[in-house]
Amino acid sequence: VFIIAHQNLINPNLKKSISVSDSNNKKSDMGLISIPELIIGNITFENSSALVLQEDKNLFFDCFEVDGLIGSNLFRNSIIQIDAKSKTLRITNDEKLLQFNKLNKLKLKLIGNQKSPYMQIKIKNVVAAEEWVLFDTGMDNFYDLSKKHYDIFKKHNIFSDLGTGTGGQTIGAFGAEEGNKLHKCLLTDMKIGQILFKNIEVVTTNDDNSRIGASILKYSIVTLDFNGKKIYFDLFPENIDKTAIDLVQKSRGISMSIANNKIIVGVIWDEVLNSKITVGDEITNINGVNYENKDICEIITAKSIMKNNKPVEIIVKSKTGEYIKLSL
């Protein structure tokens, strides 16, 4: 699995133990090893390092049936191009071998040993602002807002608040996000280079950094030049003539999460629902499909039905054993 903003990560025996944190700031001891050769296509990377996930924390590896993650620290001297539509990853050290729009670019800051790529975006609601965000293809959402940045922006009406809840809705390398106070907001405008996005619903994250995630790959080819410290965006043909890309979506009254191999109520955003259900209640049925005995990997790898604009019907099993039907 290729994830920008992550370190190389594999699963053999531990060699040297260090402590790291994931996207939810959950910490774990991990091993550190050296890999003499790592071959991708016809390119050989020599003497690269990799973290080692412990045996009892391999749900991600098991469910997606992968042996590791390839992160940005491997490409510190490379140019990589991600074309999600054609499912193609291009790697080179010569920009002449790639075709991309050199006008629509942003500067990159490469932070830490893993060379995590940060770029500056422009955001606007009532007031305009700029924000340095991590480009993270391991995050499925379009945009995650760090709680630290939210506290700053709230004072200046950068976002419109849609709700507040306690719980979690994301899963990192070391497990699901735990009970944090979260905020759901609406951002009117976001500009990434020359591309304008509108109506972005965003939830705060416990991570220190705001992030642009893999969902941007639905709209654009992305080219990262780690040597030149630049990132380029090429809109797909169906988006080129649009003055803005509208990301409006149906706002749901809850967010889902996973605990004890079950789908649960992760966050309650609609205050009316607080009298009916609680965080941690099991979700047993979604749109007529029973999930009580579904395999955890089937749940984790399935495409989320909460991210489209179609109505969703769920059945929630309360702590008292009552089954409650809800329309979201």
Q: Can you annotate each of these PLM segments?
A:
Residues V1-L328:
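Pepsin/retropepsin-fold aspartyl endopeptidases
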